[in-house]
Amino acid sequence: MIVNFTARHTELTEDIRDYCEKRLKRMGKILDEVQQIEVILTEEKSRKRAELLVKRAGEDFALSEETTDMFNSLNKVFDSLERKIVKERRK
């Protein structure tokens, strides 16, 4: 799986990169069909947005969360990703 990071109007720190990689590694088994994930971090005034663009065979989708803290946004968007993939596997 390829993971790309993009930061818009904010700095991509090692802490943020490490956090993302740890969360993705923890979800390893459920992400086996995923080919590429793009993590996009955006900061506008006090709003911090985390977006995931997920590409897998036959389907691409995007998830986004916005809070006042980047780690909260990341946590919520990774939780959304996990719920979405688990839900689709149950079908």
Residues covered by each model-derived region:
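N-terminal, polar/charged subdomain of small-to-medium soluble alpha/beta proteins
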Residues: M1-K91
